[in-house]
């Protein structure tokens, strides 16, 4: 599922959290750790992500491909509902 996406103007990686398999948006730049709903999730200083379950439907709708095309988040929604 690893895919580069845009969310709030930032390039993040749509992936699954290694410990639980939950879908999340993983940082690609250390400066992204200050984004709303970003959580420290690991032992290494660069392990931060936003879990999709913590985003509202409207916030999830803001996740797009790198060219701005909205993503079909159906599979990820099924994992978090």
Name each model-derived stretch.
Residues 5-6, 17:
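Well-ordered beta-strand positions
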Residues 2-3, 25:
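Residue-level detector of beta-strand structural context in well-folded domains
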């Amino acid at each position: 599922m690893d895919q580069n996406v845009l969310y709030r103007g930032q390039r993040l990686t749509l992936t699954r959290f290694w410990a639980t398999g939950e879908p999340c948006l993983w940082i690609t730049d250390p400066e992204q750790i200050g984004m709303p709903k970003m959580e420290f999730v690991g032992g290494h200083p660069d392990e931060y992500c936003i879990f999709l379950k913590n985003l509202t439907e409207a916030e999830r709708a803001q996740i797009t491909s790198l060219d701005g095309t909205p993503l079909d988040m159906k599979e990820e929604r099924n994992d978090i509902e």
